[in-house]
Amino acid sequence: MEARDILKRPVITEKSSEAMAEDKYTFDVDTRVNKTQVKMAVEEIFNVKVASVNIMNYKPKKKRMGRYQGYTNKRRKAIVTLKEGSIDLFN
């Protein structure tokens, strides 16, 4: 799996924006990847040094549309902490 396939999109919320001040960046990632693969992908794409990676899994939620019922997609979110002295990702 290539680095561009691992990171789907950055997560831009109020909480993740506040965490950027502490050099913590949040991404939606592929559900099949592990912390090491996320670390290598961020270092390759953005040319920064990663200190740590925390991953959260979100289960699919049950949703109804009239009489039909289904599930939302499951998600996996990674919070990447950069080492001191690294460049900002989004500047």
From Swiss-Prot:
One of its GO terms (biological process) is translation. One of its GO terms (molecular function) is rRNA binding. This is Large ribosomal subunit protein uL23. It holds the Pfam family Ribosomal_L23. Part of the 50S ribosomal subunit. Contacts protein L29, and trigger factor when it is bound to the ribosome. NCBIfam families: PRK05738.2-4. One of the early assembly proteins it binds 23S rRNA. One of the proteins that surrounds the polypeptide exit tunnel on the outside of the ribosome. Forms the main docking site for trigger factor binding to the ribosome. Keywords: Ribonucleoprotein, Ribosomal protein, RNA-binding, rRNA-binding. It comes from the Bacteria. Belongs to the universal ribosomal protein uL23 family. GO terms for cellular component: cytosolic large ribosomal subunit.
